[in-house]
Design a protein with these regions (language model features):
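Intrinsically disordered, low-complexity segments enriched in small/flexible residues
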Residues: 232-236, 240, 251-252
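Crotonase-fold acyl-CoA enzyme core
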Residues: 96-208
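Glycine- (often His-adjacent) and acidic-residue-rich active-site loop
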Residues: 59-93, 112
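Catalytic-core regions built around general acid/base machinery
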Residues: 42, 89-100
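Terminal peptide-recognition signature
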Residues: 21, 39, 57, 70, ...
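A general structural signal for well-ordered alpha-helical segments in protein cores
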Residues: 36, 71, 90, 149, ...
């Protein structure tokens, strides 16, 4: 199953009871709205299929896990409704991960920026390579990590999230991210990453379905309001991205 997008892809591959959902975009695995919609739909569909016991979320390529929002699309936003619609795409992906009654394992092979940190935070268990540095860059482009913030704070705590959000031009190492709870494991390279992810997915696929559902619900307790919260946060980002300041910063990045 391969949802069609204008550029890039979201692909779903079943390996027994394990579903691998992979996204790719030629611009550093950035996420335009069509890929976000396809990703949310794939996670929801696979997560509610009884034949699937665990989901692995991954990206194509070997250098960058996810570059965050598509700057090309951000530069095209002219109305608040457009901004809300775009940032709601990230909200929908995070909420899809939260709502499915299956564990979602993250495979992070390289750098995660902005929304990419949000994806790594939203998965139930994240394994990364030593190259998987993280950065919340939103403030530097005149916005802020409003949509992904709740997921990052839930996983790493307010202090670590604040450091990332305020130091918006600085990468933090994979070791730092592991120390602060984002990554459960950090391995040397892609081969070790695949081995660790596959081993965990196989173990989880063999666990009790009923116990998995109960544990996932318990782990996400207190986030029941995120359906509304993340859309409220998307509205903030959607308003800010239209400002002259944000658009000038976005254009400066695109012109590099």
């Amino acid at each position: 199953m391969t949802p069609n997008t204008t550029e890039g892809y979201v692909r779903v591959e079943r390996r027994g009871t394990i579903s691998h959902i992979e996204f790719f975009h030629p611009q550093s695995n950035s996420l335009p709205s069509d890929l976000l919609a396809a990703l949310a739909k794939s996670i929801t569909d696979e997560g509610h299929d009884p034949a699937v016991h665990v989901i692995v979320l991954r990206s194509g390529g070997d250098r960058v896990f996810c570059g965050g929002a598509s700057f090309t699309e951000l530069a095209s936003i002219r109305a608040e409704t457009q901004g809300l619609a775009f940032f709601s795409g990230f909200a929908n992906v995070i909420n899809a991960i939260r709502r499915v009654p299956k564990f979602v394992v993250g495979r992070v092979q390289g750098k995660a920026v902005g929304g990419g940190v949000g994806l790594a935070s939203a998965v139930d268990y994240c394994i990364a390579t030593q190259h998987a540095a993280v950065k919340l860059s939103e403030l530097a482009v005149g916005i802020g990590p409003f949509v992904v913030g709740p997921a990052v704070e839930r996983k790493m705590g307010l202090s670590a999230m604040s450091q990332l959000a305020i130091d918006a031009t600085e990468f933090r190492s994979a070791a730092w991210a592991q120390q602060h709870g984002l990554y459960a494991q950090v391995v040397d390279d892609a081969a070790a990453l695949d081995a660790a992810v596959d081993a965990l997915a196989e173990r989880l696929a063999g666990q009790s379905v009923e116990a998995t559902v109960a544990l996932k619900n318990a782990l996400w307790h207190g986030t029941e309001h995120w359906g509304e919260l993340l859309l409220e946060r998307a509205a903030i980002s959607g308003r800010l991205v239209r400002t002259d300041d944000a658009q000038s910063r976005i254009q400066a990045i695109l012109s590099k």
